[in-house]
């Protein structure tokens, strides 16, 4: 026994084994353990939960470590003790050593887990497939609503005494109504988590006031019901570091690095999570680095993910108000995935609502860099970037996803894409560079593309309805805007193309109309577009058996010279050389069209008459026609008219 000195009641030990073996502790003793895991202790005979870090069993009682602030992993003799310590709420642990996880570590409410520069947790798939869990549970009992609760309402009602809800209680609402954020292929039903801010009872009915409005109608006809879940609240993970680089241990696969279910106010920052997927491989071991299921008010900031089998951050269930900032994901399936739930094994409830991703980067993902699967509402990505994805850079598989100032580089498919049954993603000031198929693909259900750019793809924009407004498109080999449908049963809707720069740069047409899939050009309007350099060949058509009617066109440019000037009428007429153009044939895969000439009278002699344009002619020089020799005639209804007339040529 290594008792160094004994000055009652002080007892000082040089090693842990000696301390826990000492048989004669008294309650009044002052006890000190030396060394890196040392500290001061008190002795008690009161039963305590032993974790071999802050509480030790000794002969006749227990030693309790005296400390203020966090506990340290270096205090604990094994992983099991850390699991025991963190199994209670209100814990604060600093991981300052390399830990081998032999089971999942459950984290409870009001707890913080911090990692130092030397702190790590290494998973061990032989005994634990998950690493960190922040997990509550769904209600075990549900009660029906007493009356319908409409979307936008912040009050629900139940029968008096049916639900033990008080201020601060969380509620979980659900019904048989299907989620409507996207195609919802699996038939997931609606649900939401809300917090009680007030309760009142009158006339046999309890009214419960909620902290936030409902997103859906909860109707009795849909079997709307409510229960009280067990929630884990207020958890913070600072610099979590899971796994290491440069290992050969194939047993370190994990299904989830950090998994949260029925949690609120969960915050993860500055972490590193490393999977065991072979570099570049598509195996699915290690499903998610971080997984939020039925969580509210969650954030991830400044965290890096590497070699994850599936997702960097996965969001599913009725998770709401989730924000992900400044993450970096390398060689994962998707950096961020808002995910569906399969109902093959039974009913599922909830879709992600109010998701925001900001300044996130995805590198060399094995599928789309950022994905939204099938359901979800009010989803937005801001200043996010995808590099070298093996599929799309960004994929919207739920309706109305909004992208602001995002960028996609060198995707194997589309820079930005939607999917079957998905309507109207919104792109604002986004950039797409050198993506194989298209910069922006809105051909599954329409979309809005505002002030964006696409360069170096087959098509700048593939679209079947909506709006392309502003922006610049270059080096797209087939066309800058391809009006098509990627799914035959998708309905074409009206399309506005306005103020777009599609100047000819040696490749491709300005606009391509895909008659093979039934595209009707009359549903398209084109105005204020710069198609300089395309000349007669601004449009490409295919698949039409008879010549279609062209789109509505106004103030588009085909040239930057020879399109404005002033003419003086002589005897009521002037012939003007200008770059007027037209196609007057009736070939099926072509439009019949002619330039629009705008006339503005500059002088008003007494002989002024009504002005018209006649006799548009195109130069036919062989082998190369000269567009500067094209001409049109301005004619006045008064043969004596000598007015000066300004003219402008548009398409």
UniProtKB/Swiss-Prot annotation:
For this UniProt entry, which segments traverse the membrane?
none
Q: What is the effect of changing residue 378 to A?
A: Almost no effect on enzymatic activity
Q: Where does substrate bind?
A: 130, 177, 217, 291, 314, 339-340, 378
A GO BP entry:
symbiont entry into host cell via disruption of host cell envelope
Gene3D superfamilies hit by this protein: Single-stranded right-handed beta-helix, Pectin lyase-like
Q: In chain numbering, where does the site feature Important for catalysis fall?
A: 311, 373, 397
Question: Does the keyword field hold Lyase?
Answer: yes
Q: Does the keyword Lipid metabolism apply?
A: no
User: Chief localization class?
Assistant: virion
Q: Which Pfam families match?
A: K1-lyase_C, K1-lyase_N, K1-lyase_Rider
Quote a single Gene Ontology cellular component term.
Answer: virus tail
Source domain of life: Viruses
Outcome of mutating residue 472 to A, per the record? 70% loss of enzymatic activity and 20% loss of adsorption efficiency
An example Gene Ontology molecular-function term: lyase activity
Give residue numbers for the site Important for the adsorption and infectivity of phage: 472
Keywords in alphabetical order: Degradation of host capsule during virus entry, Degradation of host cell envelope components during virus entry, Host-virus interaction, Lyase, Viral attachment to host adhesion receptor, Viral attachment to host cell, Viral tail protein, Virion, Virus entry into host cell
Function in brief:
Functions as a receptor binding protein (RBP) and mediates the attachment to the host capsular exopolysaccharides. Displays a lyase activity that specifically degrades the K1-type polysaccharides of Klebsiella pneumoniae capsule.
Q: How does it assemble?
A: Homotrimer.
What does the similarity note say?
A: Belongs to the K1-specific depolymerase family.
**UniProt name for this protein:** Depolymerase, capsule K1-specific
